[in-house]
């Protein structure tokens, strides 16, 4: 028995641990010691990647279909971690293999805030919905 179309997939247990781009690491350190203020322009947006980025450069973002970045509301940090407080749905996906995510602020020229790989890549086909359950995207600093 096949899944009804469009398919819906849920991913759990994704963690971004200390995967901050160099520019954000520097901005947060400057803010921490008071040399430069850091101003966040929200909301935080979650983007899906078909190739992962690193500290120096962004990955390759999904394109096509009705794909678009999704606004992400977050819990209050506790124990060095913070998670998404609501389910996140990417509807109308194009055919793609999603291997990671990146977080962006939402100002005129969005800044990449964090990045990370999925523990297991997810193949989606045209029209699918890719879903992240509440509390499944975790950011942590140690």
Where are these regions (language model features)?
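Small cysteine-rich, disulfide-bonded extracellular modules of the LU/uPAR three-finger superfamily
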Residues: 9-100, 105-142
């Amino acid at each position: 028995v096949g899944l009804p179309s469009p398919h819906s997939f849920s991913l759990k247990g994704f963690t971004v641990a200390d995967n901050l781009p160099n520019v954000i690491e520097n901005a947060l350190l400057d803010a921490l010691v008071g040399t430069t203020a850091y101003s966040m322009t929200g909301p935080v947006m979650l983007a899906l990647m078909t190739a992962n980025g690193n500290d120096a450069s962004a990955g390759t973002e999904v394109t096509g279909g009705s794909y678009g970045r999704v606004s992400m509301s977050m819990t209050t940090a506790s124990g060095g971690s913070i998670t998404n407080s609501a389910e996140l749905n990417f509807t109308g996906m194009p055919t793609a293999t999603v291997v990671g995510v990146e977080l962006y602020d939402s100002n005129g020229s969005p800044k990449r805030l964090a990045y990370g790989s999925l523990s297991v890549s997810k193949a989606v086909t045209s029209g699918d919905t890719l879903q992240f359950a509440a509390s499944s995207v975790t950011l942590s600093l140690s």
